Amino acid sequence: MEGMDVDLDPELMQKFSCLGTTDKDVLISEFQRLLGFQLNPAGCAFFLDMTNWNLQAAIGAYYDFESPNISVPSMSFVEDVTIGEGESIPPDTQFVKTWRIQNSGAEAWPPGVCLKYVGGDQFGHVNMVMVRSLEPQEIADVSVQMCSPSRAGMYQGQWRMCTATGLYYGDVIWVILSVEVGGLLGVTQQLSSFETEFNTQPHRKVEGNFNPFASPQKNRQSDENNLKDPGGSEFDSISKNTWAPAPDTWAPAPDQTEQDQNRLSQNSVNLSPSSHANNLSVVTYSKGLHGPYPFGQS
C-alpha cells in the first residue's frame, strides 16, 4: 500500500485534492474547524483562495504565516454558570448565557478583547461582547443576551475570545441548547431576576400602624393619633363633654347648659360652708348672669 502511494502521480493527487472545490462554503467551514476556530471565515477564504482551494495546502500556508513567535493571550474555560443551566427553553424566548473564564497565562490580556461568535447556530443578533482585560490567573464571568430559535430541537454554537487585531485565543466555548414548548429556562431566569431586584432595593423602615395599602391621608391620621396620650387626659374629657356640639346642632343645648351652670353654682356653694352670706352672694352672682335677681341687684 505504501508503494502504491509512492507511485501515484503528484499531479493526480493535486487534482484529487481539489475535487469538490466548487462548494467553497464547505471548505471554509472545514478549514475553520480544523484550526480550532482560530481564524474567521474571511481569513479562511483568503488562505484557501491563495492555494487554489486546496484544504491541505491552505492549512500549511496558514501555519507558515503564523510561524513567527507571537505572544498570544491564554484563556481557560472554567464552568457554565448560567441560571437554569441544563433546562430546556421555549421557542422565541429571551435568555442570558453566562460563562466563567480565566486568564491562564502569565501576562495580562491586551485591551479591547472580546468574546465572539465563531460558528454553529447564532442565538439572536448579538455576535460579540466586550470583555475587560484580565490579569494573570484572574477569573471573571461573561454574559451574553440570546434568544432561542423559533422551532423545537437541539442547537449548538461556538464562541471564542478574540483580540482587537482579530486573533482568536483560548478554549472554544460551546452553546448547546434544547428548545421545547414546555421549557422552563426562561421562567427560571425571570424568577431569579425578580428575586435579585427585590433584594437589592432599599427597604423603608415601617413603624406604628402603617398600612402600605391605605391612602396617605389615613396613614397621616394614624400617625397623629399615635402622638396623643394613650391614656387620655382629664382636660380632653372635660372639653369634649362641655364644648362638643350636639349631633343635630352647632350650639350647646339650653337644658344641658343650665344644668352645667347649676352644678357649677352648687359646687361653689359647697366649697364655702362657713358663711351663709357668702353662699348667697355666690349663688346670686352665678344666677345673675342668666336671669332675674331674686335678692335684687347688688
UniProtKB/Swiss-Prot annotation:
CDD domains: NBR1_like, UBA_CF106
SUPFAM superfamilies named in the record: UBA-like
Keywords of the record: Cytoplasm, Immunity, Innate immunity, Nucleus, Phosphoprotein
Region of interest called Disordered, as start-end residue ranges on this chain: 199-277
GO terms of molecular function: ubiquitin binding
Localisation per UniProt entry: Cytoplasm; Nucleus
InterPro entries documented for this protein: C6orf106_UBA-like (IPR039517), Ig-like_fold (IPR013783), N_BRCA1_central (IPR032350), UBA-like_sf (IPR009060)
Induction: Expression is icreased in presence of dsRNA such as poly(I:C).
Tissue specificity remark: Expressed in lung (at protein level).
Biased composition (Polar residues): 262-277
Domain of life where this protein originates: Eukaryota
GO biological process, one term: negative regulation of type I interferon production
Positions carrying Phosphoserine: S215, S222, S272
Residue pairs linked by disulfide bridges in the UniProt entry: none
Gene Ontology terms: cellular component: centrosome; cytoplasm; cytosol; nuclear speck; nucleus; phagophore assembly site
Signal peptide range: none
Biased amino acid composition, Low complexity: 242-255
Subunit and interaction comment: Interacts with IRF3; the interaction inhibits IRF3 binding to its DNA consensus sequence.
Chain's role: Negative regulator of innate antiviral response. Blocks IRF3-dependent cytokine production such as IFNA, IFNB and TNF. Interacts with IRF3 and inhibits IRF3 recruitment to type I IFN promoter sequences while also reducing nuclear levels of the coactivators EP300 and CREBBP.
Name recorded for this polypeptide: Protein ILRUN
Source species: Homo sapiens
